[in-house]
Amino acid sequence: MGWQKLFVASATVAIASTLVWDSTAQAADLSYSKMYVFGDSLSDSGNIYNSSPQQFPTYYFNGRFSNGPNWVDYLAQDLGLTPTTFITQQSTPLPFPQIPTQSVNFAFGGATTGLDNTITQIAPGLQQQVQAYMGGLLTTNQTADPNALYILWAGANDYLPTESTWFTPPTTANQTINNISFALNSLLNAGAKQIAVANLPSLGQLPLTFGTQDETRLNNLAQAHNLALGQTINSLSQSYNAKIVSLNFASLFADAVNNPGNYNFTNVTQGCLLVQCQNPDQFLFWDFIHPTTEGHKLLAKEAYSALRTSVPEPGEELGLLLLGVLGAASIYKRKKSLDSLALSGKIVSD
């Protein structure tokens, strides 16, 4: 009777699961309570602008380092979130907030993965950004929201040539990866469970560096960085039993450079501003380093796709369930056959 009950119960679950297919599919869509962003100018949605005299060149859009919204803006829109900037108005020194009650973008243009910022010494690097968020948690004795999405993209300013007199770029990726690992450990130890980490494009392919003596060296650094970053992500994911999604922006940039026509680009080596272009949507880069808003759209699409892929499809879950039902049915059938044989005296039970 126990085996019969098991089979009936399993079949009932399978039927019920089929009936709620639509609601299961909806539940599998991306859903985060908040979004916290840490990084540099590629993700900054106005922090450097708001912490400065607010006299950015007019060719930068609303404090972004592009001609329009950046990838964080687009991704937030796709996720139905509206992160505010960490600095909401001109403020010196930087404020130390309480725990945010909404999504917050902590990214600052010029941030390195350490303590330095290559634009101004009063602006934070990645470590201070994470600690600013952590400070709010400590003040209120709370843990990180496990249902929030934490985004981290930094490292380019560690390696690229700089006019900064207080920061010297490293010659290897070791310290940069250690810095990123430290930031990730801080978030994970605080309770973060869903993190997205982006790797670096080939830094020798930027308008700033392409065709210069630094091209090969920077490409090699980016490659070493991405390899070590992938290993770090895998290790931390297992250690903390957390979901750390890798955003492979390196592959996307490489494909855009090698196959520009696939993305409707006609120029992937020069910044639109540098040649006074009339059609920025056909350019991958806006200036020496940063993508156009069209380029940022591609980044947001790639990020959303990576996040979406990390969520199990409803069909996968149902497939596993049905497999379990079939297994139960097989066991039940075998058990029934054995019972029949035992009753006929053809086998002897222990």
What are these regions (language model features)?
Residues 311, 315-335:
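A cross-kingdom C-terminal cell-surface attachment/processing module
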Residues 329-350:
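C-terminal membrane-anchoring or membrane-association module
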Residues 4, 65, 317, 326-329, ...:
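Compositionally biased, intrinsically disordered low-complexity regions
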